[in-house]
Amino acid sequence: MARRTTTRVKRREKKNIEHGIAHIKSTFNNTIISITDRHGNAISWSSAGTIGFKGSRKSTPFAAQQAAENAAKAAMEHGLKEVECYVKGPGAGREAAIRSLQAAGLEVSVIKDVTPIPHNGCRPPKRRRV
C-alpha cells in the first residue's frame, strides 16, 4: 500500500502594523487598491476585477468602492488603523475608493496625488475614431 502524504498548511502570520499606505491606481478600465506598510511591503490588495466585475463595470465608482472595502477588511485583520492614500491615474474610482476606506474604519491621514505627468516624453497614441 502506498503511503499517504500529508501536506502541512502554513497559516499567514498576523502582522501588527498600525500605520500603512493605500496605493490607489485608478485607470479608465479598472481600479487597483494595494495597502502596504511604510516600507512598501504589501499587506493586502484588491481590484474591481478580483471582486467579480467584468468589462466596463470594472471602471465604475461602485466597483472601486467594493474593492477598497475588501482590501481594507483584509488589512484591518493585520491591525491596520491609519493609512496615507496615494492616488494615481485619471479613473472614475478615485474618490469612491478613498471614501470607502474611511467608511470601512480606517483613518485617512494624508491624500496625495502621485499621477505621473510627462515633461513631454513619449508621443501619445493616435486619437480614436469611433
Curated annotation (Swiss-Prot):
Give a GO cellular-component term: ribonucleoprotein complex
Q: Which GO terms describe its molecular function?
A: rRNA binding; structural constituent of ribosome
Q: Which InterPro entries match?
A: Ribosomal_uS11, Ribosomal_uS11_bac-type, Ribosomal_uS11_CS, Ribosomal_uS11_sf
Q: Which domain of life is it from?
A: Bacteria
Q: Which Pfam families match?
A: Ribosomal_S11
* Presence of the UniProt keyword Isomerase in the record: no
Keywords assigned by UniProt, alphabetized? Ribonucleoprotein, Ribosomal protein, RNA-binding, rRNA-binding
Mind listing the GO biological process terms from this record?
Answer: translation
- The keyword rRNA-binding belongs to this UniProt entry's keyword annotation: yes
Entry-linked NCBIfam families: PRK05309.1, uS11_bact
Identify its protein family. Answer: Belongs to the universal ribosomal protein uS11 family.
Q: How does it assemble?
A: Part of the 30S ribosomal subunit. Interacts with proteins S7 and S18. Binds to IF-3.
Q: What does this protein do?
A: Located on the platform of the 30S subunit, it bridges several disparate RNA helices of the 16S rRNA. Forms part of the Shine-Dalgarno cleft in the 70S ribosome.
What is this protein's name? Small ribosomal subunit protein uS11
The species this protein belongs to is: Syntrophomonas wolfei subsp. wolfei (strain DSM 2245B / Goettingen)
